[in-house]
Amino acid sequence: MIIEIENLIKKFSIGGGLFTALNDISLIIKKGEFSGLVGPSGSGKTTLLNIIGGLDSPTSGNVKVLDKMINETSHDERALIRKKYMGFIFQSYNLLPVYSVYENVELPLILNKIEKNKRRDKVLNAIESVG
């Protein structure tokens, strides 16, 4: 499994009470699968992504990323996992209008110092996979 979430709950303290942002979320994302998270504003999408990425902690439940309990990893390990294995596209994403689609997809690979000959295949495969 790439991502495995079991019985995830996230509550926030608000005005002397508790607000439940995520209630008993369980899901599995396997290698090779693509997933999208869609919902109205305030439904918990960003909260869930922040927990998966190790940027926030759950109130209860388990979150495994690459067979590691994300809340048991160090700050540096979580940063490496996010850098190498995760991509987040939030509601207000934008492509850079001065670049082609190819160049927009290639840009993160350039920033991560991926060799040019490897970038081409990765970019073309990514573009082909989404049509």
Per-region residue spans from a language model:
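Short coil-to-helix segment of the ABC ATPase nucleotide-binding domain corresponding to the Q-loop/switch region
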Residues: Y99-P108
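Helix-to-loop junction immediately C-terminal to a conserved catalytic motif
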Residues: G53
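Conserved ABC transporter NBD signature motif
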Residues: G61-E72
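Conserved ABC ATPase "signature" region
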Residues: K68-M69, I110-K113, N117-G131
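The feature captures the beta-strand-to-loop junction immediately N-terminal to the Walker
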Residues: V38-P40
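ABC ATPase NBD coupling module
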Residues: F19, I70-G87
